[in-house]
Each structure stands twice: as C-alpha cells, then as structure tokens.
Amino acid sequence: QVKHWNQDIKKMTDNQWRELVRSMNKLDMNMMVIQEVFRNEQYVGKHSTNVDNYQGKAFYPSKLYPGRMDIAAKDPIEAILSEADKQGMNVLMGVGMFAWFDFTPESLEWHKRVAKELWDMYGHHESFYAFYVSEESGGGLDNWEQLPEIRKKRKDDIVNFFKEFKAYCNSFAPGKPVMLATNSFEVPNGMD
C-alpha cells in the first residue's frame, strides 16, 4: 500500500495525461512540476538503500531499474512532455524518489544516473525546462534532526549534493535550472 497515492491516477492512459496537460493550459497553468519519476517510500537515516539494491518503481520505461508502477499509461512522462511542447508549456522534471529528505552521497549518485537517463530519453523536448529534486527538505536544511552532529551532517550533505548535482547536470544540459522544494518552517536555522 502506497500512502498518498490517488488510485484514479493509476487508471489514466497516455491520452488522458495529454488531455490533462491541455486542460491545465486552458486554465493558464503553463508550468508543471512532475513530483517524482520513481516511487520509493523510504526516509533518510532509516534505510540501507544504495544504487545497486534500489527497489523503487518507475513511472516511465527506465533502463536503470526494472521495477514499474502499476499504471495504465505506457509512458506518462513522454505523453506529458510531448503535449506540453505543443501547448508551449514548461515542465520541471522530477528526479526522484531515492528516499525522502536524503541528500547523502549514495542519493547523489542515484540522482546523477536518473537525471542523465531522463535527459537522454526526454531532453529533446522543448518543454523540458528544469530538473526538480523530489526529496524535499525542511526549511532549516537539517530535516529536523535532533543531535547537533547529525544536523550538521544533513546540512553538509545537502550543500554538497546540490553543488555536485548542478555541476553534473550542467555537463549535459547547460543552463537548465535545478529546483528543490523546501518548506518554510525553520528557515533561519538553515542560514549558517
């Protein structure tokens, strides 16, 4: 059982994804964020996942990992991007989910591999506007860790992650932005 999963989305075909994009465009919603391209309900510090034993399931025909989400659409990413091209929309491509709030070196390596695969498969689309790192973060960038040494490690991890990930993405997709969703809680704690 995957929490927060809308069962109706599982039934959507590629054509229904295209219709959704057209409907968004009609409402002047011209920027889309694909939240994630893999589903993996694990959390930082509470798993032993690495790039070799990753068990997440893809929403697209990934060659990196065999697991697939049980959905009707064959390739909803292609359907979304091709329709967004026609509609003149921008899409932020979700690169994730390795594990929630996880910016460790292992997560970085996984993200590099997935970002490159996504670019190789979908980078020809004009609507492919940016990379969106799906893992999210608390505003303090320490993800609510209680121990000072773990708080520092989480902050160091996220800074290193984005420095390296942005440089890596620039090597094959120069100028494409990289985005992370943080919440607004405890932002002052992340300023050090």
Describe each region flagged by the PLM.
Residues Q1-D192:
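Glycan-processing catalytic domains of CAZymes
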